[in-house]
């Protein structure tokens, strides 16, 4: 009981103080842009290449901050609920996170996710998509002391991805883009399915 109470207090402290950061989404890739190719490892250490996935069909890319974020977990669960519909459209769903594989695997298992979760080490891919922001010093200190963010991500840069979801056509064109600096707002999973249906 004490551990549960402690966890609740920690999360409340983080999400009350760590509200909206100065996240600039103006540089993020948008609808109509071409995606940047990448190769990242999944939670099992296997390499996954975007171009290879696009040869099979459309791809849904979704970024989340980490398994420690309740809003991220909720968004991932909602996508999991729509996974059958996503696959029915011939699409592949891929989640990207700066967390190290051990932590991304925990998130995948905790939420019973049946889609790929890739480690975007040092936010390199997120950066190329214009989705990286830096925590302010006060928030970074709280995240580190309460969540040990550097241990989760393998870096002390205090950078996180802006939560975003893209529907990418087979030619690499972004047909739907949802990028919101407010981490409490995420793309609706059912909307993602509807956007995929438009590609046919």
Task: Name what the model sees in each region.
Residues 1-9:
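Bacterial N-terminal signal peptides that target proteins for export
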Residues 52-75:
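Short active-site neighborhood of thiol/selenol oxidoreductases, capturing the structured segment around
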Residues 120-184:
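Thiol/selenol-based redox catalytic cores and closely related redox-interacting motifs
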